[in-house]
């Protein structure tokens, strides 16, 4: 459904025969495979979508796509499982002019840049702090930080500047994670441990960012999002919702006699109906991210959410692990270690 593109190949190594049949019907004229390397070699595509949610498969697929001359890659998130793989893909992109974009679709919502403009103009007052929480379901803790937290962390440099340092701790049932709590995590993400995480990031702007996730905290996904706490308002982001952003006006720490409600914030501003038609499809349907990737290829620029942004997000996550390994010590970014620090706990 993206203009200027045509699907030429589809591959799924775990596909059942009926899935292949369905793919043939969905993508008429495209070749369908159960081996992605064969698909790449036979179709030589310009753009490749790397779709597995299992992150340990991502790096090999990117390298295979680059080998056959792909010019752009649209990747499932999280990006990769450690900074070794992230560094390799960033270097590969620079060497070959390969544009890698990540499917953190909320970052592409046009209202995000409008919030940044309002912050810079002081229309919410002074930005004091930012707070993010994961879904805090059964995945609460480091898995939540990886899988859902990456959606949030990737957005924060837009408002706060790049991360420069981190302090963080992992807990298992209220006690700090030790070596015996560490094991291979789900979804090919590598080593992790614990069912709670509490982290504080120092950002380039001087405004702190907090991330917290506790397993089974309560109502499903009730806290999943980011809040920018300003002196005159709280700006709330709910991932994958529409409206995605709402504002509660007033001083955030002052008790009031009357309840204050939330005002939707769109690409038109506060209290303005979203001027873009079908905004849900454009964002949730990955239309805006795909169009940005096409423009990035044509203009020879970094995508809005590219490999560099992906690497920063991975580095933020692993900096929490590195701080925990050092008993909550402050660690600076970029990290010295490029592997998962929990392997050295």
Predicted feature locations:
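Beta-strand-loop-alpha-helix segment that lines the small-molecule cofactor/substrate pocket
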Residues: 42, 47, 59-108, 122
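Short acidic-hydrophobic, aromatic-tinged amphipathic segments that line or gate anion-handling sites
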Residues: 31-35
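Core-facing hydrophobic residues within beta-strands of well-ordered domains
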Residues: 5-7, 70, 127, 163
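Contiguous beta-strand/loop segments that form the cofactor/metal-binding neighborhood of enzyme cores
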Residues: 150-252, 287-303, 318-320, 335-345
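N-terminal Rossmann-like dinucleotide-binding module
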Residues: 1-27, 51
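NAD(P)-dependent dehydrogenases' Rossmann-like dinucleotide-binding region
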Residues: 103-109, 113-114, 118-140, 152, ...
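C-terminal helical cap and adjacent loop that interface with cofactors, partners, or active-site loops
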Residues: 256-345
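Short glycine-/small-residue-rich Rossmann-like dinucleotide-binding loops
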Residues: 44, 52-54, 213
